[in-house]
Amino acid sequence: MQFVQTSTLPQKTDQKFAVQKPIAIWLFVCCALVFAMVVVGGVTRLTDSGLSIVEWQPLVGTVPPLSQNDWDELFEKYHQTPQYKKVNLGMSLEEFKTIFWWEYFHRLLGRVIGLAFFIPFLYFLMKKAVDRPLGLKLSGIFLLGALQGGMGWYMVKSGLVDNPHVSQYRLTAHLGLAFAIYAAMFWVALDLLNPGRGLSANSGLRGLLNFSTMLSALVFIMVLSGGFVAGIRAGLAYNTFPLMDGHFIPPELFMLEPWYRNFFDNMTTVQFDHRLIAWTLAILVPIFWLKSRAVPLSGSARLACTLLLIMLAVQITLGISTLLLVVPLTLAAAHQAGALLLFTAALWVNHELRRQ
């Protein structure tokens, strides 16, 4: 792999930006595709469609069933799965087709994202538009994407053995990796359009940056917490708010032994943790926004801080509504999409503060 050494002379700044702008736009397009992938993946999970395709065929699997024989063969393979035997016994072929298409489009979109990243990457390399540091970053993102494909199948395999549900650990890893890939592409794209200027000596700004970094990490932790909520269907329990069936701290928090299992396997504890992180963000983000008003910031940085506050309010509203209405498909999918938009806002705030 060959990278070009980019000049750092001031007079070449405009020329460098002209080269980097198309790369940034391409990465933003890839971010949009990953966003769509997260939403489709959420719907696939919510409709219990993820176990409908029992084989991993990265190339051959691109072609959908084209004949009745193809459908019969796929349906017969599905008959051998724990999900069919324990959950969907007696399912008709037409019903199977519904869950099949969700999983098929989820996998197909993954292949599209891989090509949408790899082909332009090769093009920019051949055009010598990518210097060595950028090339290493993009190569790392591509490797993460390849790892994500394997992680997806590793997750599906966990539901094809005895338990007709995928492992919540593998599901959370799959979700977290999707957010990490998105974050890497989004950050690199922002760097290309608006490179950092170095940290300001302003102590208030440094404190605000540290605050925003903590918030970004907390949002990501909340996403992982949401993965466990989805993985063990904890959203179907305690469909009350603000209390959990009359308790702020429910008595079933530490039912399981050893105690640490409760954080991953106990529906009560998993939902409580997710609520607790949301409450924490509901307190900290408004404080952060108020602090940002007292620090001299650019217009784009102020906009980013305000969008973070707005997106948190939207996401909390979606989360509460999803809970109270017992996880309806549309709201639950919107809640998953909202998590990525909230994470995007947090990343943008962090990047903007590094440019002040």
From Swiss-Prot:
Pathway: Porphyrin-containing compound metabolism; heme A biosynthesis; heme A from heme O: step 1/1. Heme binds at residues 274, 335. Its cofactor is heme b. GO terms for molecular function: metal ion binding; oxidoreductase activity, acting on NAD(P)H, heme protein as acceptor. It is found in: Cell membrane. GO terms for cellular component: plasma membrane. The keyword Oxidoreductase applies. It comes from the Bacteria. The chain crosses the membrane at residues 23-43, 105-125, 141-161, 173-193, 212-232, 276-296, 307-327, 329-349. HAMAP family: HemeA_synth_type2 (MF_01665). PANTHER family: CYTOCHROME C OXIDASE ASSEMBLY PROTEIN COX15, CYTOCHROME C OXIDASE ASSEMBLY PROTEIN COX15 HOMOLOG. This is Heme A synthase. It comes from Nitrosospira multiformis (strain ATCC 25196 / NCIMB 11849 / C 71).
